[in-house]
């Protein structure tokens, strides 16, 4: 029982931390006729890894990169 309570607490804390790291706005649409390509490698893992107000978004290559929100 204590292990379940501890696991539940950890899940809640992780959810709170990830919600705090998300920046305002939404990622650019990569389902355009000509998607924004960017570099074909991961440049970030979450919004907190991006400078200023940029968000960590998928690019046209399928990798994650910092982008200006729309």
Swiss-Prot record:
GO terms for molecular function: peptidase inhibitor activity. It holds the Pfam family WAP. Residues 1-19 form the signal peptide. Expressed by the venom gland. Its main location: secreted. Keywords: Antibiotic, Antimicrobial, Disulfide bond, Secreted, Signal. One of its GO terms (cellular component) is extracellular region. Residues 20-70 form the WAP domain. Disulfide bonds join 27-57, 40-61, 44-56, 50-66. One of its GO terms (biological process) is defense response to bacterium. It is found in: Secreted. Transmembrane segments: none annotated. PROSITE patterns: WAP (PS51390). Belongs to the venom waprin family. Damages membranes of susceptible bacteria. Has no hemolytic activity. Not toxic to mice. Does not inhibit the proteinases elastase and cathepsin G. This is Waprin-Thr1.
């Amino acid at each position: 029982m204590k292990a379940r309570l501890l696991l539940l607490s950890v899940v809640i804390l992780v959810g709170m931390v990830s919600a705090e790291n998300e920046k305002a706005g939404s990622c650019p649409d990569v389902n355009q006729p000509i998607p924004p390509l960017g570099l074909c490698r991961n440049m970030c893992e979450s919004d907190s890894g991006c400078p200023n107000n940029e968000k960590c978004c998928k690019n046209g290559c399928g990798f994650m990169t910092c982008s200006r929100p729309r």
